[in-house]
Amino acid sequence: MKPMMCFDVDGTIRGTTDEHIVYDSTILALKKLKEAGYPIVVSTGRGRDSFLRTGIQDIADWDGFVFNNGQLITDGKGNVINAHHFKNEDVIRTIEKADELNLAVTLKKEHRIITKEPDEYVLETQRYFGNQIGPVEKYNGIDLVDMMIIYGPKGWDYKPFLDLEGISVLPGLSCFADVAIAGVSKATGIMELGKVLGSDHYVCFGDSQNDIEMMKHASSSICMGN
């Protein structure tokens, strides 16, 4: 089978300016890949709800989706192939460390929440993604959490979080870092999807730190310039 063609969303399929445009040339390229028999896949740090608000699911006949940096995998029709969730204690430790540093954390779960009032880092990230900010709520320690985002200064290394058990911290290009389950990545999600699609290799396109693992395991990888 031909390799899967795997695409990040923000900064790759679409821009990260105020317009958040998907160019006609991108849509045409996806169509031509599909017509040539390549499985086409979205691989994003966005949760499914956030992704669906972009409308990108409608620009091509996608074969599958990898959401939350590999923590949710679905087929092209949205049927769940696999889902990974944080251990509750890992979520609690992350929030406690963020509270010590007066940083906000978004929890992506059934209902997205944020742990403190949005600050300049949250608002800058919201502009970058054109995304929604959840209500301020305290985590109850019970709900399953699919993904976390920590908000901090642009270019910060998030060192205080790097030794926390059970998580992997991936600083982004704006004022945020994605937090994933340790050992789970876009690469592992693509490999899980590939078992269903019957393909064991892929080509990928991405632009940020959460794309590095995906690029390491690809047959070929293309890093976008922003």
Where are these regions (language model features)?
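Conserved Rossmann-like nucleotide-cofactor binding loop
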Residues: 12, 48, 210
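Conserved acidic, metal-coordinating active-site core of Asp-based
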Residues: 101-217, 226
